[in-house]
UniProtKB/Swiss-Prot annotation:
Pathway recorded for this protein: Carbohydrate degradation; glycolysis; pyruvate from D-glyceraldehyde 3-phosphate: step 1/5
Source species of the chain: Coturnix japonica (Japanese quail)
Documented EC number(s): 1.2.1.12, 2.6.99.-
Name under which the protein is recorded: Glyceraldehyde-3-phosphate dehydrogenase
Modification S-nitrosocysteine occurs at: C150
Keyword Nucleus: yes
Subcellular location: Cytoplasm, Cytosol; Cytoplasm, Cytoskeleton; Nucleus
Coiled-coil annotated residue ranges, if any: none
Family of this protein: Belongs to the glyceraldehyde-3-phosphate dehydrogenase family.
Superkingdom of origin organism: Eukaryota
Length: 333
């Protein structure tokens, strides 16, 4: 079983740990977070406003975090190169601080004995992998990889199925996205774009996202053919992608539904879901798929121009893919 270290015990760090425990496919052996002490880790892991109580045991014992009887070594280092991952037995490190997202910065984990690093965010220079889309291109010479973003993980499987079957000439994506930790609870200063600093609970906030362009990195044939933007909305979790695209080969909407359903039940099972139910965002809270196609929500203007809708739990679905990517990487050792 893959032995994993988690750097940064925030939303993704905690949920990757939950996903790891639930899957039983990887074992978390170490966690580093300079801002959260051990007893606070117990509390934060046990109680979650979005995903509910952890259904298991969690306690602090002998200076370790013990989850379901598994003792996890705790570090509180600010500098990733000082974390002794090797001593704790961690071979793979999930870099989930959101801070060390380049090859150089994430590479600091290798100094402490980690063998591989998975960045749980898009990266400017690390190779990006999306499970079900381009994970087969991973080879073991790569020490540092990125699991891309939650939105890229939602869009890419859908775009792949559509492109493989009908060809995408060009497309625009909008993600209606739940609030995240980088936003402000009330109006405040924002580093980059002024409106990013407006109160998250009060506003629909247009925002940038590199998720659609990143699809071109994981599906090279779509490079330059997709771009997109986000609306941040006042919901705590679950987001939805709207992909509006021009098709090379004409297709009836029923044809599109058929191929997506076939992919969801076949090669992309567990990654891409399919539903014809009258669902809303809450119905996907805690859903482990990267993307669930909403057959009833999409529309076609004509046989070449369509709007496709797909839901995702931007926290938990993504965290499950981080685990899946590590399992896949380990299978190549």
């Amino acid at each position: 079983m893959v032995k994993v270290g988690v750097n940064g015990f925030g939303r993704i760090g905690r949920l990757v740990t939950r996903a790891a425990v639930l899957s039983g496919k990887v074992q978390v052996v170490a966690i580093n977070d300079p801002f959260i002490d051990l007893n606070y880790m117990v509390y934060m892991f046990k109680y979650d406003s979005t995903h509910g109580h952890f259904k298991g045991t969690v306690k602090a014992e002998n200076g370790k975090l013990v989850i379901n009887g598994n003792a996890i070594t705790i570090f509180q280092e600010r500098d990733p190169s000082n974390i002794k991952w090797g001593d704790a037995g961690a071979e793979y490190v999930v870099e989930s601080t959101g801070v060390f997202t380049t090859m150089e910065k994430a590479g600091a984990h290798l100094k402490g004995g980690a063998k591989r690093v998975i960045i749980s965010a898009p990266s400017a220079d690390a190779p990006m992998f999306v499970m079900g889309v381009n994970h087969e291109k991973y080879d073991k010479s790569l020490k540092i990889v990125s699991n891309a973003s939650c939105t890229t993980n939602c869009l890419a499987p859908l775009a792949k199925v559509i492109h493989d079957n009908f060809g995408i000439v060009e497309g625009l994506m909008t993600t209606v996205h739940a609030i995240t930790a980088t936003q402000k609870t009330v109006d405040g200063p924002s580093g980059k774009l002024w409106r990013d600093g407006r109160g998250a609970a009060q506003n629909i906030i247009p925002a940038s996202t590199g998720a659609a362009k990143a699809v071109g990195k994981v599906i090279p044939e779509l490079n330059g053919k997709l771009t997109g933007m986000a609306f941040r909305v006042p919901t705590p979790n679950v987001s939805v992608v709207d992909l509006t695209c021009r098709l090379e080969k004409p297709a009836k909407y029923d044809d599109i539904k058929r191929v997506v359903k076939a992919a969801a039940e076949g090669p992309l099972k567990g990654i891409l879901g399919y539903t014809e139910d009258q669902v809303v965002s809450c119905d996907f809270n805690g859903d482990s798929h990267s993307s669930t196609f909403d057959a009833g929500a999409g529309i076609a203007l004509n046989d070449n121009f369509v709007k496709l809708v797909s839901w995702y739990d931007n926290e938990f679905g993504y965290s499950n893919r981080v685990v899946d990517l590590m399992v896949h990487m380990a299978s190549k050792e």
